[in-house]
Amino acid sequence: MPMLEKYEFFQEAYFVNDVEEACEKWARAYNAGPFIVVPHHKTDTFMYRGTDQEADVTYGFGYLGEMMIQFIQQHDDTPSIYRDMFGPGEEGFHHVGLLVNDYAGEKARMDEMGYTLACELHADNVDACYYDTRSLNGGFTELHDDPQHILSSFAGWYRAHQLRRPGDPAIMPRITD
């Protein structure tokens, strides 16, 4: 049973030491972005390998072509899917993301394929989980559900990328309610 029977990757994610620095570098090198930076992101619920614990992380989100790029910076040593792969000072590829409209069904498929659920969270009316697929791709695979409000946010970020010109700011302000 192939993992990508129905969905394509929508995201590549990288663990970095400094999210803002990574956004600046990718904007200069690849004209990626602009990026939205979410400092010290908090979830409504967060489970890591069956334990209710949440690491202190900052995220950066932007586009390079049609691919969303995510940068992750962990500010503490709490056990996490990030510390599973990287110690302090280390950086690199972390996960690919699938935007799915049948979250429960896709979780069941991943379970049937024998991958281990490493992390699950709920934030901003969105469910997401990460399966440990390091034996397959050297990282994790994220399943991210697709409610309309998140699709609208992603479309706005993608449009900002389409309008981006070399030299524009790498980071754009985050609009919050």
Where are these regions (language model features)?
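Short, charge-patterned binding micro-sites
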Residues: 42-47
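Conserved beta-strand edge residues that scaffold enzyme active sites
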Residues: 40-41, 124
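Glyoxalase I/VOC metalloenzyme domain signal
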Residues: 1-10, 14-36, 49-116, 132-177
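Short acidic/glycine-enriched loop/turn segments that link adjacent beta-strands
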Residues: 8, 124-127
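Short beta-strand
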Residues: 119-122
